[in-house]
């Protein structure tokens, strides 16, 4: 059978003969055999529930919308290397060669009809509700289906994107289900209406996903058609999403927005190249969305952004936990759907904090898909000079595939091992005479001295603001709300102060520039026996003023 992990293909040969039995035409194509369905409320391939580890992909190159075969090959190679198993063709059917690549090398595909009327909104003016546009909706749906229906990579049909919902999408859904009942059909704007087999809302929070899967009698899986929004410094919340996907059967992943930055390289008058964005072309003042076109996991020439490494790590299909530190016993979970871990080799080592290899080895592991297995690597005696060590696990393929070589690390884990407490190499030194002063009006740490020398250039106060990322500036719940609440201009006012010989406890109001209280903060300052000052801060926002905050701590 065909799957993204084992894309088994066969060659179908068709011969056309005339009435006399003579062959007049011969043609052929690659075909694969697999099932795609919603079974017991879960999205399944070949009867097996799978997690969608996906991304959205626009067609983009330095030639514009014309994408070469070589660039498509580069795209699929990178996706396979970075543990992506699904691609959504956003927001239109793409070059036929892309389908052949996904069939051949193994990517699940969500093929999307070229229907988007975003500018008309989702209300009564939506074209989805106007039956005079039914023929246009049906025509684009028919063309998508009939052109590509035999590709095994297409496991889900998408009716379109951000075009409202109404009679026209109900009819396109009905038609798709009439010609092919099994393969799932999704449409984000249908939400929980009947004309979608998957609840595929975009950019829902972790709490919203938990609320959905916690309901009784749900019969559709939650698979986000878009999530994370990989613009600039991003993807920091991915771990929390996947803690839900890996523990809630009805939450089955999603497709990151998106794969590639849609901008161009230009050369300036000094011969240096730079990226262009919206506003760099056309007359001055022409409307644009600025750098909003740059929200990919890779840049426009397919160089990975740093957050693609986060995606690779979280999407990896082999994950381990350390259950016995003394004997280096690890519990390994196989998240592959159709692959035994005996297709991979485990290389492990223990390194000291200076990178010295203290022990190493290789291991073959037999573990069926979705199963777990305990593996004991054996106790390692650490030298007396080692204060801290690290157990590193690295997985690679035993045999190369066309896109993934045997030297490519497909998964890794690292665990901290406690070294010797009484190491001869490191002995605590006395910190000298340390003293601190807390301002009695603000509660701020106003002075910290060591042997009489001041260490602070200015008092240390609570900060609830930081430079905004691209997503912070775009997000309606981001930096604009932080500024509206005045979190970028704060003062402190002591409510209570308790001082002891080596500690101080402060409770303070936190005020914005308008004098409004945005919350209460508790500070605990404490010197330890070595002279180190430890500060613990707790902040409780006033939700009447503070509607959103940057992550703290």
Spans of model-derived segments:
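Substrate-binding/catalytic cleft of secreted carbohydrate-active enzymes
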Residues: 73-81, 86-299
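Secreted/periplasmic carbohydrate-active enzymes, especially glycoside hydrolases
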Residues: 1-95, 101, 105-109, 140, ...
């Amino acid at each position: 059978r065909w799957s993204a992990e084992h894309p088994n293909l066969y060659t179908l040969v068709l011969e056309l003969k005339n009435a006399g039995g003579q062959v007049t035409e011969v043609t052929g194509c690659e075909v694969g055999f697999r099932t795609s369905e919603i079974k017991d409320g879960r999205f399944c391939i070949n009867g097996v529930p799978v997690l969608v580890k996906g991304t959205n992909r626009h067609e983009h190159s330095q030639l514009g919308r014309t994408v070469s075969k070589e660039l498509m090959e580069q795209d699929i190679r990178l996706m396979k290397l970075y543990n992506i198993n699904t691609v959504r063709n956003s927001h239109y059917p793409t070059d036929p060669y892309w389908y052949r690549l996904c069939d051949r090398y193994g990517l699940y595909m969500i093929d999307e009809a070229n229907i988007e009327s975003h500018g008309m909104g989702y209300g009564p003016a939506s074209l989805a509700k106007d039956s005079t546009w039914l023929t246009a909706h049906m025509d684009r749906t028919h063309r998508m289906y009939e052109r590509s229906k035999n590709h095994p990579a297409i496991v889900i049909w998408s009716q379109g994107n951000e075009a409202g919902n109404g009679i026209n999408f109900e009819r396109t859904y009905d038609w798709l289900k009439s010609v092919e009942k099994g393969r799932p059909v999704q449409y984000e704007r249908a939400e929980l209406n009947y004309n979608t087999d998957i609840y595929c809302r975009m950019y829902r929070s972790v709490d919203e996903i938990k609320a959905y899967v916690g309901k009784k009698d749900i019969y559709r899986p939650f698979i986000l058609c878009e999530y994370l929004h990989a613009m600039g410094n991003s993807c920091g919340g991915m771990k929390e999403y996947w803690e839900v996907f890996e523990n809630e059967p009805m939450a089955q992943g999603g497709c990151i927005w998106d794969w590639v930055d849609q901008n161009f390289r230009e050369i300036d008058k000094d011969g240096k190249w730079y990226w262009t964005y919206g506003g760099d072309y056309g007359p001055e003042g022409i409307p644009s969305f600025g750098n909003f076109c740059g929200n990919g996991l890779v840049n426009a020439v397919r160089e990975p952004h740093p957050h693609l490494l986060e995606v690779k790590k979280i999407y990896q299909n082999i994950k381990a936990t350390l259950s016995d530190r003394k004997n280096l016993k690890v519990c390994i979970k196989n998240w592959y759907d159709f692959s035994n871990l005996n297709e991979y080799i485990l290389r492990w080592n223990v390194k000291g904090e200076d990178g010295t290899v203290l022990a190493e080895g290789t291991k073959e592991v037999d573990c069926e898909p979705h199963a777990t297995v305990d593996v004991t690597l054996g106790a390692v005696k650490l030298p007396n000079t080692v204060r801290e060590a690290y157990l590193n696990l690295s997985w690679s393929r035993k045999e190369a595939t066309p896109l993934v070589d045997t030297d490519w690390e497909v998964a890794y884990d690292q665990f901290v091992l406690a070294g010797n407490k009484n190491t001869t190499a490191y002995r605590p030194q006395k910190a000298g005479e340390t003293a601190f002063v807390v301002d009695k009006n603000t509660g701020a740490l106003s002075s910290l001295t060591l042997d009489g020398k001041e260490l602070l250039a200015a008092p240390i106060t609570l900060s609830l603001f930081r430079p905004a990322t691209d997503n912070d500036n775009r997000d309606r719940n981001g930096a604009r709300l932080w500024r509206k609440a005045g979190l970028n201009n704060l003062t402190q006012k002591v409510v209570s102060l308790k001082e002891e010989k080596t500690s101080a406890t402060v409770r303070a109001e936190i005020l914005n520039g308008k004098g409004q209280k945005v919350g209460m903060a508790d500070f605990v300052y404490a010197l330890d026996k070595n002279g180190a000052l430890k500060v613990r801060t707790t902040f409780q926002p006033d939700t009447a003023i503070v509607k959103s905050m940057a992550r703290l701590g």
